[in-house]
From Swiss-Prot:
It comes from Hydrogenovibrio crunogenus (strain DSM 25203 / XCL-2). Gene3D superfamilies: P-loop containing nucleotide triphosphate hydrolases. InterPro entries: AAA+_ATPase, DNA_recomb/repair_RecA, DNA_recomb/repair_RecA_CS, P-loop_NTPase, RecA-like_C, RecA-like_N, RecA_ATP-bd, RecA_C_sf. PROSITE patterns: RECA_1, RECA_2, RECA_3. Belongs to the RecA family. Residues 328-347 are annotated as: Disordered. ATP binds at G66, P67, E68, S69, S70, G71, K72, T73. It comes from the Bacteria. This is Protein RecA.
Length: 347
């Protein structure tokens, strides 16, 4: 670049910083420019691996959607617990008015320090979310759920009144305001969403999510969570087998999927994941129903091995570290760009 262009560029950069503040524009090589994306664990080792960066990206919008009782809130509560372990502050905007503090505590959430809001309208919920994000003091905000963000006009109107597109407009406007603040404050904002059926779809997937298309575009990560089976002990059902598909990922290659167990009253079975991934990576040997570790039998059947790992936390931690070393991305590994990894018509 010749000297005149350099001077013109420096003058323009100086003018921008003077008008909009320091850090409003910078070179990617400058100290303080964000290149590596911070992440927070989902509480599931397999899902952290599938996401490619070791968890959910901070400073981004994430959407988690699925049918009823599929594990959406459980997954977000695990993410809150992991953020609190890192010393972060968490907020839960409970538009559904259905948060169970006893269950949250069982999953490891510090409920005494969890900020909770139960707003009356969708506008109020999104204004509260925006205020929390702009404060820069909250590390993770959960909105549960998009379907429950009822516009004020609908609440104040009569039953049977038509309010076509109100919720979609509300979400679109809110996300335009939120996105820049989310990036600037490095806050992770997770929207939980529900599934609806499109009427008259003959071919293709009739499923869609509520709240219009804005959230699909603004989300850096979209997770589709489904219950695929039950975990039984005799006739008693202990939990659900769950599958999560990464349907959109702007920070790593998408379309990976992972399966794990959610146990009632306990949340994601970390020991179960360590067993499955340990067998896959040949750290645990499996012969018939018997499992062995370093040549020694550790149990017959998955339930017994799960209990063995609970009773022997040292072995559990060793296995977890070995699995992470093998499967987690290395810090200097090349990362894909947002443009290359944007969604390719999966909605």
């Amino acid at each position: 670049m010749d000297e005149n262009k350099k001077k013109a560029l420096e003058a323009a950069l100086g003018q921008i910083e003077k008008q909009f503040g320091k850090g409003s524009i910078m070179r990617m090589g400058d100290k303080g420019a964000i290149r590596d994306i911070d992440s927070v664990s989902t509480g599931s080792l397999g899902l952290d691996v599938a996401l490619g960066i070791g968890g959910l990206p901070r400073g981004r919008v994430v959407e988690i959607y699925g049918p009823e009782s599929s594990g959406k809130t459980t997954l977000t509560l695990h993410a809150i617990a992991e953020m609190q372990k890192m010393g972060g502050t968490a907020a839960f905007v409970d538009a559904e008015h259905a948060l169970d503090p006893i269950y949250a505590e069982k999953l490891g959430v510090d409920i005494d320090n969890l900020l909770v809001s139960q707003p009356d309208t969708g506008e109020q919920a999104l204004e509260i979310t925006d205020s929390l994000v702009r404060s820069g003091a909250v590390d993770i905000v959960i909105v549960d759920s998009v379907a429950a963000l009822t516009p004020k006009a609908e609440i104040e109107g009569d039953m049977g009144d038509s309010h076509m597109g109100l919720q979609a407009r509300l979400m679109s406007q809110a996300l335009r305001k939120l996105t820049a603040n989310i990036k600037r404050t490095n806050t992770l904002v997770i929207f939980i969403n529900q599934i609806r059926m499109k009427i008259g779809v003959m071919f293709g997937n009739p499923e869609t999510t509520t709240g219009g298309n804005a959230l699909k575009f603004y989300s850096s990560v979209r997770l589709d969570i489904r219950r695929i089976g039950a975990i039984k002990k005799g006739d008693e059902i202990l939990g659900n087998e769950t599958r999560v598909k990464v349907v959109k990922n702007k920070v790593s290659p998408p379309f990976k999927q992972v399966e794990f167990e959610i146990l009632y009253g306990q949340g994601i079975s970390r020991e179960g994941e360590v067993i499955d991934l340990g067998v896959k990576e040949k750290l645990i040997e499996k012969a018939g129903a018997w499992y062995s570790y370093q040549g020694q039998k550790i149990g017959q059947g998955k339930d017994n091995v799960r209990q063995f790992l609970k009773d022997n936390p040292d072995i559990y931690e060793t296995l977890q570290v070995q699995i992470k070393e093998r499967l987690m991305p290395k810090p200097n590994a090349p990362k894909a760009t947002d443009e290359a990894l944007d969604e390719t018509g999966t909605d």
